[in-house]
Amino acid sequence: MNSLLSVGDQIESGIYRFHSRFNRVVNFERHGRLVSVVDEQIGPGPLNIVLRGGFSLSPSEGERAGVRGPFSLQGSGAHCALKVRGTLLPSAFPPLKITTSSVVFAAHRFTFSLRQRYHSTFDFDPGNLHCFHHNLSIFGELLTECAPSKSLAFLLDETRLKNFRSGFEQAFADRICRGAHQVFHGHLLEGIRSLKGCGLGLTPSGDDFIAGLLIALNLLQELRGQAFQPTADAIFGAAEGDNIFSNTFLDLARRGLLFGRMKDLLIELMTGSEASVRKATGKLLAIGASSGADLATGFFLTVHEQSRPVERGCQRQPMDRIG
């Protein structure tokens, strides 16, 4: 049995050099484009190669300064684990080699067929709008109830601001609140620039929020037939920076290309039961310390704000007009 489960549909053939590694992920880069080899817990995505089994990649903190070696893929068939020992320079980590039908990772070759290509898009059915809006309200309630305490869910429930106590945390929350207000009240790109890079981690909270916003715009474009792509492109231009992780994630979101857990959630929002929406939401919120929740907050607020009628005197600007 092949240990390679899926290959993202945005992965191009070529040789990729080692970039960075984390507990369940090894990242490779080519021409400013990241491709990630991940385990089943991370799951599929447009630029993910999913291998069956777990990675033994201590420490859990990522590093670029060096990698541990030599390399061994232990097990075969149903189980495959990468073991890494010793110390090597990044240049000594074997490159990732990809063709139209094979992947060479850590000196091991895996073949794949079209059936193993992960498809990062799906067709939306505008006829399911009633179900979608019902499930969206459930999703919003789950965000408020279940999101991590230090996530951006305080934008949905301001009582959560009590979790931000230090001067740094309060300044962070103030900047997020200001940026989100600008985004939804006529100063879209100014708000995006306020949110850009705001927070800690590989993909700061502000960037995760923007990614959720971009995914929402693609969904609204499909459901309503409105031309949101120029807005999404402008948002990406304002949000793009020096962080290759954020840039990669934001570019995929701009183009409506979804990783597995987000795609599963959208499918359940369109057609699922309350129980299935709860399950999909839980899986999304489990990503990172708060990344999944921050993405979810940006997605929910954008769909919610763009779906409600504009009240007289309200400065909210539809997002198909760039401000």
Question: What are these model-derived regions, one by one?
Answer:
Residues 63-64, 85:
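Glycine-biased, low-complexity coil/linker segments
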